[in-house]
């Protein structure tokens, strides 16, 4: 009786890994033994970078807001303080988008934040 090696299932499993390794360089896309390691490592990078992406976008939004606010004569932290004082609850994603795409709307928000800071500072000086 011939030896059963579960051939069709093994071939399917190897083919699936090799298809996922398509585009990798050299033997990492040709040989199952190395393609498997490369695909598993790629999955680790994918998982890690899905988590990192959130922080990277937050840093990008902060940089864009900071650049727009500095052009208008405030720092990022003072601007955020002004937004809080003016009870403006816009997140950084929306603020960054406004700073890049709709400067008039951003100017209105900036003016409100600056006014709130001045009112807050004036109240602190009077106290």
Curated annotation (Swiss-Prot):
<comment type="similarity">
    <text>Belongs to the bacterial ribosomal protein bL20 family.</text>
</comment>
<dbReference type="InterPro" id="IPR049946">
    <property type="entry name" value="RIBOSOMAL_L20_CS"/>
</dbReference>
<dbReference type="InterPro" id="IPR005813">
    <property type="entry name" value="Ribosomal_bL20"/>
</dbReference>
<keyword id="KW-0694">RNA-binding</keyword>
<dbReference type="GO" id="GO:0003735">
    <property type="term" value="F:structural constituent of ribosome"/>
</dbReference>
<dbReference type="InterPro" id="IPR035566">
    <property type="entry name" value="Ribosomal_protein_bL20_C"/>
</dbReference>
<keyword id="KW-0689">Ribosomal protein</keyword>
<dbReference type="GO" id="GO:0000027">
    <property type="term" value="P:ribosomal large subunit assembly"/>
</dbReference>
<keyword id="KW-0699">rRNA-binding</keyword>
<keyword id="KW-0687">Ribonucleoprotein</keyword>
<dbReference type="GO" id="GO:0006412">
    <property type="term" value="P:translation"/>
</dbReference>
<dbReference type="Pfam" id="PF00453">
    <property type="entry name" value="Ribosomal_L20"/>
</dbReference>
<comment type="function">
    <text>Binds directly to 23S ribosomal RNA and is necessary for the in vitro assembly process of the 50S ribosomal subunit. It is not involved in the protein synthesizing functions of that subunit.</text>
</comment>
<protein>
    <recommendedName>
        <fullName>Large ribosomal subunit protein bL20</fullName>
    </recommendedName>
</protein>
<dbReference type="GO" id="GO:1990904">
    <property type="term" value="C:ribonucleoprotein complex"/>
</dbReference>
<dbReference type="GO" id="GO:0019843">
    <property type="term" value="F:rRNA binding"/>
</dbReference>
<dbReference type="GO" id="GO:0005840">
    <property type="term" value="C:ribosome"/>
</dbReference>
């Amino acid at each position: 009786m011939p030896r059963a090696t579960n051939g069709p299932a093994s071939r399917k499993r190897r083919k699936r890994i090799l298809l996922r390794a398509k585009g990798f360089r050299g033997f990492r896309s040709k040989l199952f033994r190395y393609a498997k390691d490369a695909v598993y490592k790629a999955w680790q990078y994918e998982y890690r970078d899905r988590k990192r992406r959130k922080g990277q976008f937050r840093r990008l939004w902060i940089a864009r807001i900071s650049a727009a606010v500095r052009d208008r004569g405030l720092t990022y932290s003072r601007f955020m303080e002004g937004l809080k004082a003016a009870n403006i609850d816009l997140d950084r994603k929306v603020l960054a988008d406004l700073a890049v795409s709709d400067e008039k709307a951003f100017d209105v928000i900036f003016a409100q934040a600056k006014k709130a800071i001045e009112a807050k500072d004036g109240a602190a000086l009077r106290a």
